[in-house]
Amino acid sequence: MSFNHQEIEKKWQGHWEENKTFRTPDETEKPKFYALDMFPYPSGAGLHVGHPEGYTATDILSRMKRMQGYNVLHPMGWDAFGLPAEQYALDTGNSPAEFTELNINTFRNQIKALGFSYDWDREVNTTDPTYYKWTQWIFLKLFEKGLAYVDEVPVNWCPALGTVLANEEIIDGKSERGGHPVERRPMRQWMLKITAYGDRLLEDLDELNWPESLKDMQRNWIGRSEGAEVHFNIDGTDEKFTVFTTRPDTLFGASYCVLAPEHALVANITIPEQKEAVEAYINSVKMKSDLERTELAKEKTGVFTGAYAVNPVNGEKLPIWIADYVLATYGTGAVMAVPAHDERDYEFASTFNLPMKEVVKGGDISKEAYTGDGAHVNSAFLDGLNKEKAIVKMIEWLEVTSAGNQKVTYRLRDWLFSRQRYWGEPIPVIHWEDGTMTAVKEEELPLVLPKTENIRPSGTGESPLANIEEWVNVVDPETGKKGRRETNTMPQWAGSCWYYLRYIDPNNSEALVDPEKVKQWLPVDIYIGGAEHAVLHLLYARFWHKVLYDIGVVPTKEPFQQLFNQGMILGENNEKMSKSKGNVVNPDDIVASHGADTLRLYEMFMGPLDASIAWSENGLDGARRFLDRVWRLFIQENGELSEKITDAPNKDLEKAYHQTVKKVTEDYAELRFNTAISQMMVFINDAYKAETLPKEYVEGFVKMIAPVAPHIGEELWNKLGYSETITYASWPTFDESKLVEDEVEIVVQIMGKVRTKLTMSKDASKEEMEQLALEAIKEQIEGKTVRKVIVVPGKLVNVVAN
C-alpha cells in the first residue's frame, strides 16, 4: 500500500498552522540558529520549481537544528516593490498594490503547501508602510552621515516612454518594452556613498565563510587599485585635468591622452576645426551603455580634439583625444595612454596611427604591447630600475614637484539610489523654494506612498509622483516657506538590504530592532539563495549593515556568517526554464500528482546543491517510489505498524544504522543532501533484508527523513505511538564503536597474482590467516612446493609456490 500524500500533507499542514508549531520564542537558554532564505519577489507567475530548492535546504537544516536543541529562527517574507508590478499596472490599469497583494497570497499558499517550517508570525512585506518606515529611517541616517547626496549622473533616458530605464530594461540600445531608442543624458539623482566603505567591504570578506569564488566576485567588483594621480596642464590654456594610473613608472612613455566624451573640459578645449567631428562623436556615444563602451573585443573609436596636454615629467606635448572606452563615471574620466605597455592603448594607437615609445625592456612593441616587468629605458631618472622600484621613485617625484600624488582608487562606483518610478519607497526629503533641502522629521515617518490612479510617467524625467500636486507641494508650518517633496523613489534593493534584521523583531513600532534581540540572533548563521545576487544585493546589504554597526544599531560587523548559492534547475533538455520555451514546471502540479514530500526529496537528491541540473520526470517518479518503499516497510496494508518492528535488538542492522546516523548528520550540516539521501536508501535496502526492525532504529530513521519529507515523517511518528509533533523530538545519535568493522576482507595471492578473497576476523593472527589462505587455494597449489608465505595482517596473504 502506498501512502495518500494529499490526505497526509493537508492534515499535518493544518496541524502545524493551528498549533503554531514553528513559532520562534525569544528565549535565550538554548543556543540559536538563524537560517535565512533570499526572500522572493512575488511575481504574477507564482512559485516555480527553482524556488523550493534553496527553501528545502534551509528547512532541512532548521528542522535538524530544532531536534538538536537549538532555538531556530527561520522566517519568510516578500521583496514586493519593483518594476514588474508597475509595468503590470501600466498595462492593465489595475493598482500595483492590489496586484502585489494577490501575488503574495498565491506565493504564501504555494509555500505553505510545500511544508516549510517558517514562523509566519514574523512575515515581512517591503511594501507595508510599517516596514518601509524603517527603510526610510535608514535613509535619514545615511543622509545625516553625509552618505546620501544628490548628483548629476548620466542615465538611460527613453524619450518615447518618458522615463529613465535600468540597464536590464534595455536590449541592444532599445527599450525592452516597445523597442524605443534609448539615450544617455545627465539627470539629478540620489547617490549613496558606498565608496566610503570600500576598504572595509573588501577587508572583512576574509572573515566570512563564503565560497571563495563569490568573495572574488565581490573583490573584483570593489576593484581596489593602488597607483598615482598625475596632473596634466592643457597647452596654451589655464585648464588642467587629472588621470589615475596604476603604472606611474611609464609616464615617460605617454604619447597621447584620452578624455571621456562627457568630460567637462571637452567643449572648452576642442578647436573650431574639430568641433563638428567631436559633437557628432559625442552624439553617437549617447546611445551606448557603459557595458557596450568598455567591451574589450570591440573596435576602438575616437576623435582628436585638436588640443594638447603637457607631460609634466618631460614637457612633451601629447594630443588629446576623446573615446567611448573611457567613462566619465570611472576614475577621473581621463587617461594617459602608454601604447607600448598597455593593450587597450596599443590597439587604439594602432587604429589611429599614434606614436609609441618603449620605456620598459623585455618585449617587441612592433608586434604587441609589453605589460611585463623589466628594466626601465628612455626614462631619465628611472633608467635601469624594475617596475616596483620605478613606481615608488616616480610617486616621490610627483609629490615633490606637486605634479601628482599617491592614490588608491576603486572600480566600485557610488550607488545610484533613485528611480523615476511610482512603485517604490518615497525618499523622505523636501526641496524648499530657497534652494535648501531638508529631511522629513523622524516622527513623521513613514512618508506613505500616496494612492493614485495615474502612475503614467510624468514625461519630464521625474517619477509619476510629480503628477500628484496635493502630495508633492508642501508648506513649512513654522515659516510659511513653500517646498516640493522629492519625487524619486528608492530602488528595489533598498527593502532587501535589511529585511533579515526586521525578522528578528517584526512588530516593533519604536525601533528598527530591539538591541537585546539583535544581539541574540546576529549574525545570520546560513543564508541561501541564487548566485545572481552574488554581487549587488550582498554588497549593498553589507554596506547598510556596516553603517548600522557604526551608529550602534547592530552589534556585528557583518550580517551573514555563511553563504551558499544553490544551482539552477533547468528544463528536461538542459535549457533554462522559461515561459517562452514552454518548459516551466509548476510545483503545484507536482504537489498534486506526487506530493510535497516527493518534490522536496527529489530536488535534494538531484545532485549537489550548488550544481545546475536538468529536471527529470523519471527522477521524480523514483523519489516517490522510495517514499512508498519507506511507507510499506513500516506500515502494513491495514494501516497498522509492521509486525517486523520489535523492541528486541538486531545485530545485523546495528552497523548500518549507526553509519546512517553519522553520515546523515554530517551531510545535512555540510549541505550534502544528495549523499545523505543515498545513505538512507542504503539503510532501507538493508532493513528490507532484515528479519526484524528494532523500534529504536525505526524511530531514528523517521527522525532523519522528517527534515526532507516532513509530512510522511509526522505521520510515521504518529503511527509509532507519539501524540506530539516530531519537530522537537531529539535527534538520533550514533555510537562510534558500532561503526568499527569486526571482519575484514583479505586478499589471497599466489606468486603476486590475486586468486581469491576471504572474510575473516580483523583480529586473526598471522598463523590463522596463513592456515585459512592455504585451505582456500589448496587445489591451485596441488603438486607444488610452498617456498614461502608472506602475511600482511588485516590485508593480504601471498603464497610463493612452484
Curated annotation (Swiss-Prot):
Any Pfam family matching the protein: tRNA-synt_1g
Principal location: cytoplasm
S-S bridge residues: none
Record-listed E.C. numbers: 6.1.1.4
Motif segment ('KMSKS' region): 576-580
GO BP annotations, alphabetical order: leucyl-tRNA aminoacylation
Domain of life per record: Bacteria
GO cellular component, one term: cytosol
Xref: Gene3D superfamilies: 3.10.20.590, HUPs, Isoleucyl-tRNA Synthetase, Domain 1
Enzymatic reactions: tRNA(Leu) + L-leucine + ATP = L-leucyl-tRNA(Leu) + AMP + diphosphate
Subcellular location as annotated: Cytoplasm
Claim: Nucleotide-binding is one of the keywords in the record: yes
Binding residues annotated for ATP, in chain numbering: 579
Enzyme class (EC, first level): ligase
Record-level Gene Ontology MF annotations: aminoacyl-tRNA deacylase activity; ATP binding; leucine-tRNA ligase activity
Keywords: Aminoacyl-tRNA synthetase, ATP-binding, Cytoplasm, Ligase, Nucleotide-binding, Protein biosynthesis
UniProt motif 'HIGH' region: location: 40-51
Family: Belongs to the class-I aminoacyl-tRNA synthetase family.
Name the UniProt record assigns to this protein: Leucine--tRNA ligase
